[in-house]
């Protein structure tokens, strides 16, 4: 049987240790390994994973281009690996960056509202999501951190009412630490979930 992982994070090797530590601190967990491409490939092989989507999330607009270039280069030459790029919703030049992402071969987009400190349904991002939908790119949303109100299931439902053609994937089964809310509110047709 072929196994797939659609939610793996990687960072440039010089940043992987710091990024892994920062993410662990943010969530109050211990991350034992650095999140870089060589380690991911080795561990995927041991686990029998043959397809993998890698991503990371820019925390501000100034990080977007470098992150997308890195992700495209990281998966080049690795059969079975695809990259989802990142965008900061509402950033200047989002149309051009979305086109560049397609030219780079990126296959979707990862949004982390809690790291970006911008609610999924924030008005500033609506035109960005419409542009993403026009390009038929799926968006993997980090979902449901109950410490904040940026990534609630209700907010994704609100966004999909405004941009119903958006292909949304709700990470962490639709609501990291808020699954009951996800089950109650995140019912739009066409939403996919990662588990």
Spans of model-derived segments:
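Catalytic pocket-lining loop regions of alpha/beta-barrel enzymes
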Residues: 107-108, 121-195
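Flexible loop residues that form catalytic
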Residues: 9, 57, 114, 173-174
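A generic "structured core" feature
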Residues: 2-11, 45, 99-101, 128, ...
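Short beta-strand segments
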Residues: 5, 53-56, 86, 169-171, ...
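Active-site gating/metal-coordination segments in enzymes
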Residues: 50-51, 59-140, 145-147, 192
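Short, glycine/charged-enriched secondary-structure capping and boundary segments
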Residues: 18-21, 67-69, 97-100, 123-125, ...
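An N-terminally biased module of ancient metal coordination in phosphate/nucleic-acid-related enzymes
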Residues: 1-62
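Alpha-helical scaffolding within the catalytic cores
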Residues: 35-41, 66-71, 93-96, 153-156, ...
């Amino acid at each position: 049987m072929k196994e797939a992982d659609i939610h793996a994070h990687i960072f440039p090797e010089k940043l992987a240790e710091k990024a892994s530590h920062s993410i662990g601190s943010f969530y109050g967990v211990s991350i034992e390994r650095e999140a870089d491409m060589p380690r991911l490939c080795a561990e995927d092989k041991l686990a029998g994973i043959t397809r993998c989507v890698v991503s990371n999330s820019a925390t501000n607009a100034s990080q977007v281009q470098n992150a997308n270039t890195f992700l495209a280069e990281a998966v080049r030459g690795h059969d079975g690996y695809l990259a989802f790029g990142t965008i900061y919703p509402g950033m200047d030049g989002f149309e051009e960056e979305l086109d560049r992402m397609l030219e780079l071969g990126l296959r979707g987009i990862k949004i982390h509202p809690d790291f970006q400190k911008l609610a999924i349904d924030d008005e500033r991002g609506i035109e960005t999501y419409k542009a993403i939908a026009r390009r038929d790119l799926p968006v993997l949303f980090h979902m449901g951190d109950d410490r904040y109100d940026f990534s609630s299931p209700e907010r994704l439902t609100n966004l999909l009412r405004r941009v119903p053609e958006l292909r949304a994937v709700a990470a962490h089964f639709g609501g990291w630490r808020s699954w009951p809310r996800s089950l109650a509110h995140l019912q739009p047709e066409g939403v996919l979930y990662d588990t």
